[in-house]
Design a protein with these regions (language model features):
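Conserved short "hinge" loops at termini or chain/domain junctions
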Residues: 1-87, 91-93, 129-131, 136-151
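Generic N-terminal initiation segments characterized by hydrophobic and/or small/turn-forming residues
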Residues: 3, 99, 112-114, 131
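Structural motif
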Residues: 95-104
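Short, hydrophobic/amphipathic alpha-helical patches that form generic packing surfaces
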Residues: 104-116
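Short conserved catalytic/interaction loops centered on acidic-Pro-aromatic/His motifs
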Residues: 119-128
Length: 151
């Protein structure tokens, strides 16, 4: 069995969500009230407890989707880690892609849940994006190298 570990720093994840929310706040603001959406969408330090809950939901949704591969999950204070146990036929070259998609999935899922509270019109777009990343992760994990004849 091949073992890989997917990790994301909560502070890095929350920074990405904050940047995305701020960007959406600026872009969605009406011309006559430029700060209204920005103030409503901005992530502040007081939102950490909510973001912790949303990021835990994201990790647990991932685990549910790929449960046949999951060896362990750690919802730590600073880092979320999902340990996977994969078939020996798993192509290790895909690990970089899986890791990148994991980080993107976590950010998209938390952003979607954040937007559900602050800008519901954009939530489904971000949830669809998180599902796309989730499907790419599953596709890479379940991809197998074709058998090779030893010569």
């Amino acid at each position: 069995m091949k073992e890989i570990s997917l990790s994301v720093s909560r502070s890095r994840l929350y920074g990405e969500v904050a940047r995305t929310a701020a960007y959406l706040g600026v872009k969605q603001a009406p011309a006559d009230q430029p700060g209204e959406h920005f103030d409503r969408l901005t992530v502040i330090d007081g939102d950490k407890v909510l973001l912790d809950r949303l990021s835990n939901e994201a990790a647990l949704a991932l685990v549910e989707h790929i449960k046949s591969c999951v060896a362990a999950i750690d919802l730590g204070e600073e880092v979320i880690t999902v340990s996977l146990s994969l078939s020996d036929a798993y192509d290790s070259c895909l690990t970089v892609s899986v890791t990148g998609n994991f980080e993107a999935y976590m950010a998209a899922f938390v952003t979607a849940r954040w937007l559900r509270l602050t800008l519901p019109a954009k939530e489904e777009v971000w949830m669809a994006e998180s599902r796309r990343f989730l499907n790419e992760i599953a596709s890479a994990l379940y991809h197998r190298n074709p058998p090779r004849r030893h010569t």
